[in-house]
């Protein structure tokens, strides 16, 4: 009886350990996934826009591609408006995934708004705007930087046009905000990057020879994919092994002489990053009222002038008849 109890206790203890380990693995995995999104820049840079005006996403996405932003010319205080970011690309293109296979391109964007502008709260967004937004999830670049918004990566087939719901500030409640013209900056990428934040290459870029010499051996890795290329220096017999991950296509063959930094592979990258800017005016309602009053007074003055002219013409005509 005692033996059965001990066995039961041992089984219970092992099951508890297994459940605990499984939960830890799940938590760690989920954390790593969430930390990888939406963009690596959040982990490495306090501000996504450098003093030179360059957005840091260009450090990893080396190819230059277009991006477009559309915002209203002017907005009133405490108003929700749309900032539309367009990331165009050929929808037929396929990119190299991390496992070396081909797949659709993803897109992502960072929107740098003026201080005081921020993501509109859900209860202020109209149903029409929510429909345009789709199922996108926006977040602040930092908890203390609500004016910088990021989104992605998301499927490019569905979200090559991204609608940001923005709430304009009210200078009456935010004294640091004024009725002025402000710049808005945007960066948008399509496809994976070529360099990781730690400086290492992804498999979505070209690989060059790290030494000059004869390609003495090419070994194809069967399990993970990719190649091991052995380069032999005929002058001293030194051998250099370059590792090529799965994805890029090999351009060299055994027995071929290659130079230092000569491309060993094709460049599989079909995506790229672009940045742009726009301007928006935070308009004072009193100015609009003043402008309307001025226009109304001008119209009334014109009407009075016309009436006065007609009256004068009638007087002249009466004098001539007399």
From Swiss-Prot:
Keywords: Chloroplast, Electron transport, Heme, Iron, Membrane, Metal-binding, Photosynthesis, Plastid, Signal, Thylakoid, Transmembrane, Transmembrane helix, Transport. Pfam families: Apocytochr_F_C, Apocytochr_F_N. Its cofactor is heme. It is found in: Plastid, Chloroplast thylakoid membrane. GO terms for cellular component: chloroplast thylakoid membrane. Heme binds at residues 37, 57, 60-61. The keyword tRNA-binding does not apply. GO terms for biological process: photosynthesis. One of its GO terms (molecular function) is electron transfer activity. InterPro entries: Cyt-f_TM, Cyt_f, Cyt_f_lg_dom, Cyt_f_lg_dom_sf, Rudment_hybrid_motif. Its main location: plastid. Residues 1-36 form the signal peptide. The chain crosses the membrane at residues 288-308. Component of the cytochrome b6-f complex, which mediates electron transfer between photosystem II (PSII) and photosystem I (PSI), cyclic electron flow around PSI, and state transitions. Belongs to the cytochrome f family. The 4 large subunits of the cytochrome b6-f complex are cytochrome b6, subunit IV (17 kDa polypeptide, petD), cytochrome f and the Rieske protein, while the 4 small subunits are PetG, PetL, PetM and PetN. The complex functions as a dimer. This is Cytochrome f. It comes from Nymphaea alba (White water-lily).
